[in-house]
């Protein structure tokens, strides 16, 4: 079973429909015990990192996420679900995040229109997550903040919006994307299908490059 964490994020129904479309064996969960028992975990999200972290802490999900990632359970973070993996966020003040990947969530430069809303191309590294997806394929973004990290090896996909920023990251069993695959048409569904296949067949190696 793939646990999809429900903490009140607005994009949950879209994420669920997309995962069901690619025939993922999902269960929407609010109980940390269900996350700990899952074969894989998805954290969708929209909104602010501070609000998301507050909700996760109140539910006891922050510790559950750390535990399952530490023991190798495949994990997919979407949009804010990617951002909360960072060490900290500068959104509405400095806030501590899960600290599972190196970096800080920072706002786009003041001269840019934010949030970035719409389609943008992703240059990817051709790893297994991107199998069958052309380099430069467009995905749907809605965000004002991005992951700033010095860990180049962490990044599997990049996008230009005022600067070159990480659109996707992967390490060991962690995979995360800044865009919304559930709103990104055929390539978003292809990416979700790839992740589901990797998560169910390769276990803790899902985030590895291939």
Curated annotation (Swiss-Prot):
Q: Where in the cell is it found?
A: Cytoplasm
Q: Which reaction does it catalyse?
A: 5-[(5-phospho-1-deoxy-D-ribulos-1-ylimino)methylamino]-1-(5-phospho-beta-D-ribosyl)imidazole-4-carboxamide + L-glutamine = D-erythro-1-(imidazol-4-yl)glycerol 3-phosphate + 5-amino-1-(5-phospho-beta-D-ribosyl)imidazole-4-carboxamide + L-glutamate + H(+); L-glutamine + H2O = L-glutamate + NH4(+)
Q: Does the keyword Phosphoprotein apply?
A: no
State how it assembles: Heterodimer of HisH and HisF.
Main function: IGPS catalyzes the conversion of PRFAR and glutamine to IGP, AICAR and glutamate. The HisH subunit catalyzes the hydrolysis of glutamine to glutamate and ammonia as part of the synthesis of IGP and AICAR. The resulting ammonia molecule is channeled to the active site of HisF.
Q: Does the keyword DNA-binding apply?
A: no
Q: What is this protein called?
A: Imidazole glycerol phosphate synthase subunit HisH
List the catalytic residues.
Answer: 79, 180, 182
* Gene Ontology biological-process entries: L-histidine biosynthetic process
EC code? 4.3.2.10, 3.5.1.2
Q: Where does the record place the Glutamine amidotransferase type-1 domain?
A: 1-205
- Pathway per the UniProt entry: Amino-acid biosynthesis; L-histidine biosynthesis; L-histidine from 5-phospho-alpha-D-ribose 1-diphosphate: step 5/9
- InterPro entries attached to this UniProt entry: Class_I_gatase-like (IPR029062), GATASE (IPR017926), Imidazole-glycPsynth_HisH (IPR010139)
What keywords tag this UniProt record? Amino-acid biosynthesis, Cytoplasm, Glutamine amidotransferase, Histidine biosynthesis, Hydrolase, Lyase
Give the matching PROSITE patterns.
GATASE_TYPE_1
Give an example GO cellular component term for this record: cytoplasm
Q: Which GO terms describe its molecular function?
A: glutaminase activity; imidazoleglycerol-phosphate synthase activity; lyase activity
């Amino acid at each position: 079973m793939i646990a999809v964490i429900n903490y009140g994020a607005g994009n949950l129904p879209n994420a669920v429909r997309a995962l069901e479309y690619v025939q993922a064996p999902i269960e929407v969960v609010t109980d940390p015990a269900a996350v700990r028992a899952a074969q894989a975990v998805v954290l969708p999200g929209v909104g602010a990192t501070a609000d998301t972290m507050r909700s996760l802490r109140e539910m006891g999900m922050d510790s559950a996420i750390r535990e399952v990632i530490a023991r190798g359970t495949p994990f997919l973070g979407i949009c804010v679900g990617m951002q909360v993996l960072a060490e900290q966020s500068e959104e509405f003040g400095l806030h501590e995040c899960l600290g599972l990947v190196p970096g800080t969530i920072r706002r786009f430069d003041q001269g840019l229109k934010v949030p970035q809303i719409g389609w943008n191309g992703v240059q990817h590294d051709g790893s297994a997550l991107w199998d069958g997806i052309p380099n430069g394929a467009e995905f749907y973004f809605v965000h004002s903040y991005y992951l700033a990290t010095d860990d180049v090896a962490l990044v599997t996909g990049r996008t230009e919006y005022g600067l070159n920023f990480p659109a996707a990251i992967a390490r060991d069993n962690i995979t995360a994307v800044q865009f919304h695959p559930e709103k990104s048409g055929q390539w978003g569904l292809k990416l979700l299908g790839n992740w589901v296949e990797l998560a169910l067949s390769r276990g803790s190696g899902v985030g590895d490059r291939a």
